[in-house]
Swiss-Prot record:
Binding site for substrate: T16, A17, S18, G19, K20, S21
Binding site for ATP: G14, P15, T16, A17, S18, G19, K20, S21
Site (Interaction with substrate tRNA): T105, R127
Classification lineage: Bacteria, Pseudomonadati, Pseudomonadota, Alphaproteobacteria, Hyphomicrobiales
Cofactor(s) for this UniProt protein: Mg(2+)
Coiled-coil parts of chain: none
Protein name, as recorded: tRNA dimethylallyltransferase
Keywords assigned: ATP-binding, Magnesium, Nucleotide-binding, Transferase, tRNA processing
Record organism: Bradyrhizobium sp. (strain BTAi1 / ATCC BAA-1182)
Record-stated family: Belongs to the IPP transferase family.
Entry keyword tRNA processing: yes
Length: 305
């Protein structure tokens, strides 16, 4: 089914708890589309509850792709995402469906529409060696090493940014080239300009923050703490993306007896609210081609189609 106002794909972005999933589901039912995850945490099968993935009933109602498809032990990157998204996009198009990309990870949307820097995969042994040095020598020592090997990257990064400092060193170790040189080389986008309609759902801030708090409480009631306990029992590297999902570090601290459940919930809520605020800023500056709509306007747009 072809709908007016839609080209070859629809992109629905927005902060967490903005009502994106319900909108995408309604659009997919109306247009015969497939909902394609564009959220870096909802790819992890270990975190269905805490990342607010679509329910089993919602996933059964229309095709959903790239949800819960990755183990928490995997350091899933934007490069992995683009590779997987291409396979799904080709599959949906072959079936005549409308691809509906939905999520809040700006880097994934940027990779889809602008292309991705051509950084080759870093071998696991290189990544492990850098992480061991990080644990042994500390982040300041690795930042000093980075300053000697890639002064531009070291000047750009905060001396306490363990993840990005390690990443910059991993790339130099694996390729012999600074990260900036790789970033200057980009692959063609999967969704070039003119091939999609892009929306950013922008709720009123205070209402959004109230929804975030209420949803975190609901996730705890639905078993988020037990979910995190199972994840913690695996003993994974705390620097892995899944281990840094909003709420995971605080709930692990609670499980260790360091803080109360109420304190963990407060931290998880605050981290999620701060992330939502950053999402507004990031999309406004990085992807200005997205049309900003209130949730009411977005629902009206879908109803009009």
């Amino acid at each position: 089914m072809t709908l007016p106002g839609i080209n070859k794909a629809v992109l629905i972005a927005g902060p967490t708890a903005s009502g994106k999933s319900a909108l995408a589901l309604e659009l997919a039912q109306k247009a015969g589309g497939a909902v394609i995850n564009t959220d870096s945490m909802q790819v992890y099968r270990d975190l269905r509850v805490l990342t607010a993935r679509p329910s089993l009933a919602e996933e059964a109602a229309v095709p959903h792709r790239l949800y819960g498809c990755v183990d928490a032990a995997v350091n899933y990157s934007a490069g992995h995402y683009v590779r997987d998204a291409k396979e799904v996009l080709d599959e949906v198009r072959r079936g005549g469906g409308l691809p509906i990309f939905i999520g809040g990870t700006g880097l994934y949307f940027k990779a889809l529409t602008r292309g991705l820097s051509a950084v080759p995969p870093v071998p696991d042994e290189v990544r492990e060696a850098v992480r061991l040095r990080l644990d042994r020598d500390g982040v300041e020592a690795l930042h000093a090493e980075l300053a000697r090997r890639d002064a531009a990257a070291a000047a750009r990064l905060n001396v306490r940014d363990r993840t990005r400092i390690a990443r910059a060193l991993e790339v130099i170790e694996a390729t012999g080239r600074p990260l900036a040189e790789w970033h200057a080389e980009t692959t063609p986008p999967l969704l070039p300009e003119g091939s999609y309609r892009a929306l950013f759902i922008a709720p009123e801030r205070e209402a959004l923050y109230a929804r975030i708090d209420a949803r975190f409480d609901a996730m705890l009631a639905d078993g988020a703490l037990e979910e995190v306990a199972r994840l913690a029992a695996r003993g994974l590297d705390p620097l892995l993306p899944a281990m840094k999902a909003h709420g995971v570090p605080a709930l692990i601290r609670h499980l260790r007896g360091e803080i109360t459940r109420e304190e963990a919930a407060m931290i998880g809520k605050a981290d999620t609210r701060h992330y939502a605020k950053r999402q507004f800023t990031w999309f406004r500056h990085q992807l200005p081609e997205f049309d900003w709509l209130t949730p009411e306007q977005a629902r009206g747009w879908v109803a009009f189609l």
